[in-house]
Amino acid sequence: MNAELDALKGALDRQREHVLGILEGLSEEDLRRPVLPSGWSCLALLRHLTLDVERFWFPGVIAGEPDMAGQLTAGTEAHWYVPEDMSAEEVFADYRAAIARADAVLAAAAPEQDPAAWPVEIWPTWRLPDVRHILIHVLTEVACHSGHLDAVRELIDGTTWLGGNPYAGQALGAVTA
């Protein structure tokens, strides 16, 4: 990678840590329970981040791996569903594995590199031009969803995500009120 992608990936890594950190300590029941009227659960949002964000944008769009973009066109609603026989541990493991694969794709990428694939069947008139823009898009989406998880976690048990300055290397963590 280069300095620009390193900086963007560093910010993305902090948001990924936020997602995992705010969910730490929740029971399987709380992870599966919808809290907001829209009906998604914390595990469903984590599955969305795994399939529709980490796997789709990095291996699918940037690297052009087959079936990644096809997974999104198959129906994103299914990606917000966690089967009863899929444990929370499996959902978390899938997310971590998707991050590792995404990081490997990014390590081989350049900011100005064109995407290897684009799902024109989903977005025929919209396109992100390069890896830089894709990474910014993903960073924005993960940050938005980490905020959603913050609100839900606070509603569940009063825990909020607090921490020092992430740019100063201070540890971040969840704090129960």
For each feature predicted by the language model, list its residue ranges.
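Short, contiguous pre-domain boundary segments
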Residues: 1-2
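Short, contiguous alpha-helical
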Residues: 5, 9-24, 28-78, 119-177
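Acidic/histidine-rich alpha-helical segments that form the ligand environment
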Residues: 78-119, 130-143
